[in-house]
Amino acid sequence: MSMERNAKTPASEVRLQSGMTAVITGASSGIGAATADRLARAGMRLILVARRADRLEALTATIRSTGGAASMLPADLALDSERVRIFQAVERAGGADVLVNSAGLGWYGYYSDMPWATALEMIQVNVAAAVHLTSLFLPHMKSRGQGHIVIVGSIAAGIPSQGVALYSGSKAFLDAFATSLHRELRGTRLHVSVLRPGPVATEFFETSAARPASGPIPARRFAIRAERVAEAVWSVIKRPRRVVYVPGVLAVVPWIEASLGWLMDRLGPLHLRARRIRA
C-alpha cells in the first residue's frame, strides 16, 4: 500500500516509506479515532491503543473493511505495567515509526474541589503515559535511525484558565517536554512535535463533566471538529515541525497571555463563581 503524496514533495517534507507503522493512544474516540482514520487512509499500518476494547474492535474492523491495516491493543494507560506491555507487543510486531500520544482526561471546577483520585488519574494518563511511552519508544527509534513522536497538547497550556488548573498544567508540561526533546534531537532523523488545538468537539466534554465533582466545560461552545486535528497530525508527520496550532489563528495565544494575562487574572474566576452560586 503506497503512502499518500502530493505530486510534488517540498524539500521540507520527509520521505515516507510505504507501510510505516503508527501507534496511536486514546484511539477509541475523539482525536485518537479521527487520527486513526486519517492515517489509515494515508496508507499507514496502525496499532490502536485505548482502554475500551469494544470501541477499538469496532474501529479496527472499520479500517480493515476499507482496505486499511490495523490491530488493537486494549490497555489502561494509567498503569506503568500496561505501558510496558504495549511497547513489548509493538516490538514483537516489528516496532513503530510514529508514536501519537493523544490519550487524555479532563475535569472542570475549582482545583480545591477536585478529588485526589481524579487528579492522580489525570496525571497518569495525561502526563505519565506520554512520558513513559516516549522513554520506551525513543531508544528504539534511535537504533533505527528515524522516528517521530507526536504529542497532542492543548492551547490550554499557553493560556492557563480557571476551572482547568491541573489539565492546563498537564498540557503545559507536555508542551515543555516536547519542545525540549525537539531541541535535543535537532539535526537528526528523529522528530518530536506538539499540537496545540483549541477545544475539540468530542465526548471528552461529557466524560469530563461526569467525573466526580466536575462540571460542564464552557469552552465547548468554541469546539472544532476532531478531523481538523487529525489532519494536522498527518500534516506534521509529512512535514515535521516543533509545534502546530489548530486552527492556525491560535498562534496568537501566547502573545495574548503575555500581554493580557492581567485581564484573565481579574475576570477568570467569575464564571466558576457563578456556577458555584447556581449549584
How would you label these PLM feature ranges?
Residues 102-107:
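Conserved NAD(P)H cofactor-binding loop of Rossmann-fold oxidoreductase domains
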Residues 134, 170:
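Active-site helix of classical SDR
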Residues 184-250:
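SDR active-site lid
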Residues 44-58:
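Conserved glycine-rich Rossmann-like NAD(P)H-binding loop of the short-chain dehydrogenase/reductase
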Residues 154:
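Residue(s) in the substrate-gating loop at a strand-loop-helix junction
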Residues 110-111, 118-123:
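Substrate-binding pocket helix/loop in short-chain dehydrogenase/reductase
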Residues 28-29:
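Conserved glycine-rich cofactor-binding loop
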